[in-house]
Amino acid sequence: MSDVNAVKHFLLSLQKDICQQLAAIDGGADFAEDEWQRAEGGGGCSRVLSGGRVFERAGVNFSHVTGKSLPPSASTHRPDLAGRSFQAMGVSLVIHPLSPYIPTSHANVRLFIAEKPGEEPVWWFGGGFDLTPYYGFKEDAVHWHQTAHDLCQPFGDEVYPRYKKWCDDYFFLKHRNEARGIGGLFFDDLNEPDFATSFAFIRAVGNGFLDGYLPIVERRKDLPWGEREREFQLYRRGRYVEFNLIWDRGTLFGLQSGGRTESILMSMPPLARWEYQHQPEPGSPEALLYQDFLPARDWLAESHTHNKEA
């Protein structure tokens, strides 16, 4: 598949571009680069910014790994592919800002190919992006979802609603009965209508991520905050850790396939905390997060209704 090289080139360019733009807006730290090889096949390049003015930690990882047999996390939904050799490539990133008023964000775009001698390769794309605020701002939520909607629109009216719901369903902590954040887009097993269109869609998602995120960073990075906001941010980061270690398929695939643990766990926040039976004060900004932002909402429909009324 000659198209695989084009995907790899795009992913490497995406990683470079995102790192350059994040370092520019941070202004206090740059990305350290760590190239690595995987004994079972393949390798990657992890880039991590730590201790910045804006970002406490930002990790942007590229990997292209190969293996002789699909791990259980990848073949559970496709038992017909069990035992096939595979290659997987992608860019995955998580950004943990210092300010509690800037949301944590995550994005991922990837290509997976399962191969068997004498048969056509089975391929699919996956990915998306999602936002995890600690303090909710409706303006930010609407902008985030408007960006997601607009990049999906050229691919069909049904794409944004479908992948928005998939994101709401996926980034949900079942053991807490609580969403991780306000969602965005999530998709997997994308192979229709063809390779070129699917590839065009992941380019739109990858390139659209910073269009959604950087304006929010700019709006919130200079807001003053104190110990109360920081403590709540660290408490909510605990939910991020719980999701990644218990529910996230990407984390499980990486660990089960003998992936590089340092790169897989790059998504973890540098600091987090847990508190027994924490309850936010009624009517507080912290309570508002649970009340108005974590329950799944159609942000764009509400925004359009409000604009018509105005």
Curated annotation (Swiss-Prot):
Biological pathway: Porphyrin-containing compound metabolism; protoporphyrin-IX biosynthesis; protoporphyrinogen-IX from coproporphyrinogen-III (O2 route): step 1/1
Q: For this protein, what reaction is catalysed?
A: coproporphyrinogen III + O2 + 2 H(+) = protoporphyrinogen IX + 2 CO2 + 2 H2O
Top enzyme class, one word, equals: oxidoreductase
**Localization of this protein:** Cytoplasm
Which sequence ranges form a coiled-coil region, renumbered to this chain?
A: none
Entry's Gene Ontology BP terms: protoporphyrinogen IX biosynthetic process
Binding of substrate, residues: S92, N108, V109, R110, G258, G259, R260
Question: What's in the keyword line of the UniProt record?
Answer: Cytoplasm, Heme biosynthesis, Metal-binding, Oxidoreductase, Porphyrin biosynthesis
Please name the catalytic residues of this protein: H106 (proton donor)
EC nos: 1.3.3.3
* GO MF term set: coproporphyrinogen oxidase activity; metal ion binding; protein homodimerization activity
Q: Which InterPro entries match?
A: Coprogen_oxidase_aer, Coprogen_oxidase_aer_sf, Coprogen_oxidase_CS
Cofactor(s) named in the record = a divalent metal cation
Q: What is the stated purpose of this protein?
A: Involved in the heme biosynthesis. Catalyzes the aerobic oxidative decarboxylation of propionate groups of rings A and B of coproporphyrinogen-III to yield the vinyl groups in protoporphyrinogen-IX.
Q: What HAMAP family does the annotation carry? A: Coprogen_oxidas
> What family does the Swiss-Prot or TrEMBL record give for this protein?
Belongs to the aerobic coproporphyrinogen-III oxidase family.
- Name this polypeptide is given: Oxygen-dependent coproporphyrinogen-III oxidase
Q: Which organism is it from?
A: Pectobacterium carotovorum subsp. carotovorum (strain PC1)
What taxonomic classification does the UniProt entry list for its organism? Bacteria, Pseudomonadati, Pseudomonadota, Gammaproteobacteria, Enterobacterales
